[in-house]
Design a protein with these regions (language model features):
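Donor nucleotide-sugar binding/catalytic pocket of nucleotide-sugar-dependent glycosyltransferases
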Residues: 40-89
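Aromatic "clamp/platform" in nucleotide-sugar-dependent glycosyltransferases that forms part
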Residues: 170
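Nucleotide-activated donor-binding/catalytic signature segment of Leloir-type glycosyltransferases, i.e.
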Residues: 134-153
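Nucleotide-sugar donor phosphate/pyrophosphate-binding loop at the beta->alpha transition
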Residues: 15-17, 24-45, 55
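A charged, aromatic-enriched C-terminal amphipathic alpha-helix characteristic of glycosyltransferases
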Residues: 89-91, 221-255
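Short hydrophobic beta-strand element within catalytic cores of glycosyltransferases
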Residues: 178, 183, 187-190
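Short alpha-helical donor nucleotide-sugar binding micro-motif in glycosyltransferases
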Residues: 47, 149, 157-162, 243
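Conserved donor-binding/catalytic core segment of Leloir-type glycosyltransferases
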Residues: 92-126
Length: 260
């Protein structure tokens, strides 16, 4: 669909923008023997045809710029703070041994979930999400509570009932699930890589460490109200305004180029 719309716009000289959400080159390389540089070349050609390419973080912007992507614009993410809040509770996991360590997301090889499930932690591990690796992980880790996919209030209840959100991915461009956890008053433990570095950084709402188990233990000491406070800086209103500003800037940029 993206290529079809791109062709339509280029043929009719219509201004358009794109957005870069997923590390397709790395995801593809994790499954098939396709060189990362090949896939980036295809994506670079696609995105450089537009008047602007929106990216979620400073880290991703710098990386793509180094790979030859042009007209990059920052477009951060927002969280529904009315839905994801600390006062909720989930009957599904409330009686599990504490602390409850939570993962939410696609259950697939590129998410590096094994790094979380292999940790020796007290309490319980809960995985929310579906994906191609779900059945295999269920068999390999019978001690883990796999809930499958959850959305809306059921998901929000699970977040708020947990004690630590573990984000083991090394390839996500942002990780909005971290914002959802923080908005629910839950601290984050993650690796110090792009994505977590941009969302957590030095906010104190989580801990980044190459030793993920050590990050979890430290994150459990973070006050829940501080996590909520940090998440509230990422509103849907602010994200929407940033998107609209980018669209206007792209239009003005093309108009200025036409005058040269």
């Amino acid at each position: 669909i993206g290529y079809a719309v791109r062709r339509w716009c280029l043929k009719r000289r219509r201004i358009f923008t794109t957005s870069y959400h997923t590390r397709f080159p790395e995801y593809l390389a994790a499954r098939l023997p396709v060189p990362v540089d090949w896939t980036y070349a295809v994506l670079r050609r696609f995105h450089n045809g537009g008047a602007g390419c929106m990216v979620a973080t400073a880290s991703l912007e710098a990386e793509l710029e180094g790979r030859g992507f042009r007209h990059l614009m920052r477009w951060s993410r927002g969280v529904d703070a009315d839905l994801f809040r600390p006062d909720r509770r989930s009957a599904e996991i409330a009686d599990l041994p504490r602390p409850i360590h939570l993962y939410v997301g696609r259950v697939a090889v590129e998410k590096n979930i094994g790094a979380f499930l292999d940790l020796k932690l007290s309490g319980s591990k809960v995985v929310v999400g579906d994906g191609p690796a779900l059945d295999a992980l269920r068999r390999a880790h019978p001690e883990v509570t796999f809930l499958g996919a959850r959305v809306g209030e059921a998901l929000a209840d699970i977040y708020a009932t947990s004690d630590c959100f573990v984000f083991p991915s090394r390839t996500d461009t942002f990780g909005v699930v971290m914002l959802e956890a923080m908005s629910s008053g839950v601290p984050v433990a993650a690796f110090p890589v792009a994505g977590p570095r941009d969302v957590i950084g030095d906010t104190g709402a989580g801990v980044l460490d190459e030793d993920l188990g050590r990050a979890v233990e430290a994150a459990l000491m973070i006050p829940r109200d501080h996590c909520r406070e940090v998440a509230l800086r990422h509103s849907w209103r602010a994200a929407t305004q940033q998107f609209l500003d980018n669209v206007v800037a792209a239009q003005k940029g093309c108009a200025a180029s036409a005058l040269v």
